[in-house]
Amino acid sequence: MALSDPLLSVVMPVYNERASVEEMIRRVLAVKMRIQLIVVDDASTDGTGPLLDQLQRELGFTLFRHPRNAGKGAALRRGFAAVTGDIVVIQDADREYSPEEFPDLIELIVKGRADVVYGSRFLGRHRVFLLTHYLGNRLITFIANVLYNTMLSDMETCYKMMRVEVLRSMTLRSDGFGIEPEITAKVFKRGYRVYEIPITYDGRGYEEGKKITWIDGIVALWVLLKYRFAE
């Protein structure tokens, strides 16, 4: 079913992103559509918290704070619980993904042609990947395709946009980075219409603050296997 003038709920998990979070919040709120921004501070220790308090007073977005670091999945689940929009998308607080591309991501959902849209970093322009991340992502995506009979190019993308009914149909349990493969597994097990579109991507290295590691890749594989055969 097509949507007219939808409200887009943007859930932004944040952990130690003081250098970039203000820019990303302002860029999200500058997108020319109706936006509900939900920011979840996962117990940052680098001064992100006071900055978020200041920005929240100025800009009026929804802000939650964890008393202890619980992981990206826990932060997302907290944010998802507060969603009131028609469509929801995940937005990381670093500068890797561009919220200016929300209108492209939302188009197929608004027209009623898709339930879920993934923004693929491999179909669009992107900064050169670290080889280990490139190979790891390709392997995990390949295994997801085999397990769920799909043809995704980028399972681990942050940009997973979906109708709110899709989100509400899933009981998400992962606390860490396993939330990404869990969402993918449950979306495909339920038979939703999924599209991919190209996005730009400016990936960062560990010296710039990247947090995901090879251990998270192993967790992703386990999550994909787990939810293929169990709910």
What are the residue ranges of the model-derived segments?
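Cell-envelope/extracellular polymer assembly enzymes that use nucleotide-activated donors
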Residues: L7-S9, Q36, E182
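Short, well-formed alpha-helical segments that are part of the catalytic scaffolds
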Residues: E17-A30
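Donor nucleotide-sugar binding loop of glycosyltransferases
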Residues: E17-S20, S44, K72, S98
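A conserved acidic beta->alpha catalytic loop
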Residues: D41-P50, R95
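Acceptor/aglycone-binding surface of glycosyltransferases and processive sugar-polymer synthases
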Residues: T62, R68-A82, P99-F177, D202-L221, ...
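Catalytic metal- and UDP-sugar-binding loop of GT-A-like glycosyltransferases, i.e.
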Residues: H66, Q91-A93
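Short aromatic/hydrophobic "clamp" motif used to bind/position activated sugar donors
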Residues: V88
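A short, conserved alpha-helix in the catalytic core of glycosyltransferases
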Residues: V166-M170, G176-R193
